[in-house]
Swiss-Prot record:
Keywords: Cytoplasm, RNA-binding. GO terms for cellular component: cytosol. PANTHER family: SSRA-BINDING PROTEIN (PTHR30308:SF2), TMRNA-BINDING COMPONENT OF TRANS-TRANSLATION TAGGING COMPLEX (PTHR30308). This is SsrA-binding protein. It is found in: Cytoplasm. GO terms for biological process: trans-translation.
Amino acid sequence: MAPKGSQRVVNKIVAENRKARFNYEIIDTYEAGLVLTGTEVKSLREGKANIAESYASDEGDEIWLINSHLPEYLQANRFNHEPRRRRKLLLNKREINRLRAGINRDGMTLVPLKVYFNEKGRAKLELALAKGKKLHDKRETEKERDWNRQKSRLLKGNSQ
């Protein structure tokens, strides 16, 4: 229990997959719990996780996070965890069925967006059902961003 007067950081983002929003069109997002060992939680709290090349896969009645990197906890001894092991995601049966139906559609995939600690101190993963963008879609998004930036500069310049 935290001592009185101390403030817990709410929704502290530990790792973020920034490229996912550029490479994929996000259709729907879900919040999933992570099954972690003690040393993995300690390593996460240090903020050294990497989910840039990771993805989620549906196997049987479960969803697994694959290829995420949680480095070993330095203060741990022989009971340390494997950095790139598969981690089970905790979702409701209804959510798993919805995700499975989404994956079975053409071009859909499960992409992790960010790992964070919620207000109860639990490690959570924001998971997105997404569709891969084509090269011309990425260029169009980039042009739109540039135009919005220019527009805001022009409006800012006119208001002075």
